Amino acid sequence: MEAAEKEEISVEDEAVDKTIFKDCGKIAFYRRQKQQLTKTTTYQALLGSVDTEQDSTRFQIISEATKIPLVAEVYGIEKDIFRLKINEETPLKPRLVCSGDTGSLILTNRKGDLKCHVSANPFKIDLLSKNEAVISINSLGQLYFEHLQVPHKQRATKGNGQNTPAATSQENQEDLGLWEEKFGKFVDVKANGPSSVGLDFSLHGFEHLYGIPQHAESHQLKNTRDGDAYRLYNLDVYGYQVHDKMGIYGSVPYLLAHKQGRTVGIFWLNASETLVEINTEPAVEYTLTQMGPAAAKPKVRCRTDVHWMSESGIIDVFLLTGPTPADVFKQYSYITGTQAMPPLFSLGYHQCRWNYEDEQDVKAVDAGFDEHDIPYDVMWLDIEHTEDKKYFTWDKKRFANPKRMQELLRSKKRKLVVISDPHIKVDPDYTVYAQAKEQGFFVKNPEGGDFEGVCWPGLSSYLDFTNPKVREWYSSLFAFPVYQGSTDILFLWNDMNEPSVFRGPELTMHKSAVHYGDWEHRELHNIYGFYQQMATAEGLIQRSKGKERPFVLSRSFFAGSQKYGAVWTGDNKAEWSYLKISIPMLLTLSVSGISFCGADVGGFIGNPEAELLVRWYQAGAYQPFFRGHATMNTKRREPWLFGEEYTQLIREAIRQRYALLPYLYSLFYHTHVSSQPVMRPLWVEYPDDLETFAVEDEYMLGSALLVHPVTDPQTATIDVFLPGSDEVWYDSKTFAYWKGGCTVKIPVTLDTIPVFQRGGSVVPVKTTVGTSTGWMADSPYELRVALSTQGSAVGELYLDDGHSFQYLHQNQFLYRKFLFCSSVLTNRCANEKGHYPSKCIVEQILVLGLKKKPSSVTTHLSDGRAQPAAFTYCAETSALRLEKLSLRIGEDWEVRVG
């Protein structure tokens, strides 16, 4: 390791090589489960042992093969959520928990429309809605639970004679990886032996499944009958392949299934390595000659089987019963939390590179945005800003006066983000290392010493963020007196927190490493980065004494990461295929609870051609997190370096983003309080339209805007599907309109961003764009009113100070509702609890879909004052435009169209 420490660390050390990473066939617990399940293994529920409490029912289940009892607990949770936990009744050691009739048992929710039917032999659970099966558990008999065993060396003294898979030949043990597992030069020694679990779920009538990020794959989950299961195992995969089910940076073990009339979810709460197999049995059509019409209906239903397998832990699963997509999103948020309300600046454009070289480079790039009239909010610094990759430090030569640099950014109402990774350079003279070492805050190796691996600084130890005391200490490092050179405009980026360990097995930490509570790393691998982001966000809140919202971007994530900030899709490439795959990747994150997500604009690896860069900016402008980023060995690609033609196109895309911020910020408030995604697949808004279920090249931004990015080179036309047969859609640029329920061919040039506003919506935008969000606080609004086929429209605006928690603690916010009905546009308060002084006015109103020119337009204030408003009307586009208005955004008023 000493020699490794001295070696040069470069980006190639983490370059993707698929031989570095396991496929399913090389994962021992997967092989064991697949092999054992080919045998007849039946579990029986002992319903004579039922113990019912107020909120749970407990009973034993037992395998005919092992005769070792398991304990099953079924919980009927409010909000139409059911929970099943299965654990050993008397395990040798604790297993990590991430938080009547003898023939059958029936549990019913309070409303009586949902029933949980437990069958005894063979053990099976059916979740029924209105007496029709929605989800069945263990209907395929794939329940699998490896009981903890006494190690071989102790077995003679313990006298353990239980019949287990471990009682096999030495050769078979090695093949099954029971006590140790080999992969390349690495040997994973398992102190507790085999401990994997698995269970199958049958989704009746469903064939469209989504979720279980993160994979560079389609939004709709694919069948895995080829043996290529979806892998959930957080890994640093530099330049990952597209259309691949291998695990990459984050894992959310949460799956949604959707059909006409119902959406359900399965949340498998397990932080160890997990594999998911999916198999859809299509609907079978029967003619009336084969069977009578009464029997035909149940035979037509399709079914999708989902098989979850985890390396360790217990079975702890939540079934979310919907029935609507919105209901499932809310149910999932009850368990894992909603998206944190971001500070407004973080919804602006972020400029990043590995690395901006020094303070002068930062100053020059910052000035370049102003010189070219391109707004941006945040400058980012990667690992090279530190002294020898020691986080919480500054390179004394290149960043000699970091506060002065930040004050320059502050003067322009901009922010700075710096990186802080979980690996800590082994250096006794480095304060952070010395303090953590002294207090025992690093992950341990099996022998009890500090785990050491190689990452950017060379030889490193890794903070054990699973320890609450470590998180508390880490949070304290962000205090201004401790983090020398930091100011209140400095925010954070957690990278490499899968965790990444160069030259480790699969470039990550050994599974035998030991965490707080003596838990092996294998038990909680996927939640490691989650805890770092949690501690970082808490540190930023603490440094402001609880007043200011944090901003933290994390590469690794787990279920619930939405509570602490944003994530992105990792180290993508500057290729068209990565622009295209970014859309389904972000849609999958969005429906899995993580709304604040984005992809590196332009692609992190490689040099994008100008056309690709423009198209990526145009897509990113209409996605939640908007950051340009590039690796160190690429050409510089600031927006003005590709010639004036392309500078103008990128400028326009970014300016469109800034104009749209009132709508986008309102969407984030909506997801913060009600968990509806910001970026939505079409099926979420049109749950009964079969044509939307597999669409992944376009999406909804909120409920009002449909976006279809151009993701192929030299495109002259694109086919856009406009859903809703009884709806109307308006081109946001030309105001041309189409009836919904059809696919339209749209001509595009390089300056075209295909965005359509839904009839029946009101979208608030800013009429002027500043150099950053801070300069736009008092800028006027325009209301874009797109009328439905019935001539009505509705929308909303959320407004607060954009940075503090006063919206939460002191109700300092405005929430306004706009309604156009019977030729009258009204602005009314949508939440009487909120109060916020705003100088902003509505200066312009655009009404699309007005079939004839009005004779007059008048404004009416709450004090009774009325006055005529000047207007223009275009008969060709049926567009009415009002300008030079002065209607206060926080007051009630009406605009009457005569």
UniProtKB/Swiss-Prot annotation:
<dbReference type="GO" id="GO:0006006">
    <property type="term" value="P:glucose metabolic process"/>
</dbReference>
<feature type="active site">
    <location>
        <position position="498"/>
    </location>
</feature>
<dbReference type="InterPro" id="IPR025887">
    <property type="entry name" value="Glyco_hydro_31_N_dom"/>
</dbReference>
<dbReference type="InterPro" id="IPR011013">
    <property type="entry name" value="Gal_mutarotase_sf_dom"/>
</dbReference>
<dbReference type="GO" id="GO:0030246">
    <property type="term" value="F:carbohydrate binding"/>
</dbReference>
<feature type="compositionally biased region" description="Polar residues">
    <location>
        <begin position="157"/>
        <end position="171"/>
    </location>
</feature>
<dbReference type="GO" id="GO:0004558">
    <property type="term" value="F:alpha-1,4-glucosidase activity"/>
</dbReference>
<keyword id="KW-0378">Hydrolase</keyword>
<feature type="active site" description="Proton donor">
    <location>
        <position position="571"/>
    </location>
</feature>
<dbReference type="InterPro" id="IPR030458">
    <property type="entry name" value="Glyco_hydro_31_AS"/>
</dbReference>
<dbReference type="InterPro" id="IPR000322">
    <property type="entry name" value="Glyco_hydro_31_TIM"/>
</dbReference>
<protein>
    <recommendedName>
        <fullName>Neutral alpha-glucosidase C</fullName>
        <ecNumber>3.2.1.20</ecNumber>
    </recommendedName>
</protein>
<comment type="similarity">
    <text>Belongs to the glycosyl hydrolase 31 family.</text>
</comment>
<dbReference type="Pfam" id="PF13802">
    <property type="entry name" value="Gal_mutarotas_2"/>
</dbReference>
<dbReference type="Pfam" id="PF21365">
    <property type="entry name" value="Glyco_hydro_31_3rd"/>
</dbReference>
<dbReference type="InterPro" id="IPR013780">
    <property type="entry name" value="Glyco_hydro_b"/>
</dbReference>
<comment type="function">
    <text>Has alpha-glucosidase activity.</text>
</comment>
<feature type="active site" description="Nucleophile">
    <location>
        <position position="495"/>
    </location>
</feature>
<dbReference type="InterPro" id="IPR017853">
    <property type="entry name" value="Glycoside_hydrolase_SF"/>
</dbReference>
<dbReference type="Pfam" id="PF01055">
    <property type="entry name" value="Glyco_hydro_31_2nd"/>
</dbReference>
<keyword id="KW-0326">Glycosidase</keyword>
<feature type="region of interest" description="Disordered">
    <location>
        <begin position="154"/>
        <end position="173"/>
    </location>
</feature>
<dbReference type="InterPro" id="IPR048395">
    <property type="entry name" value="Glyco_hydro_31_C"/>
</dbReference>
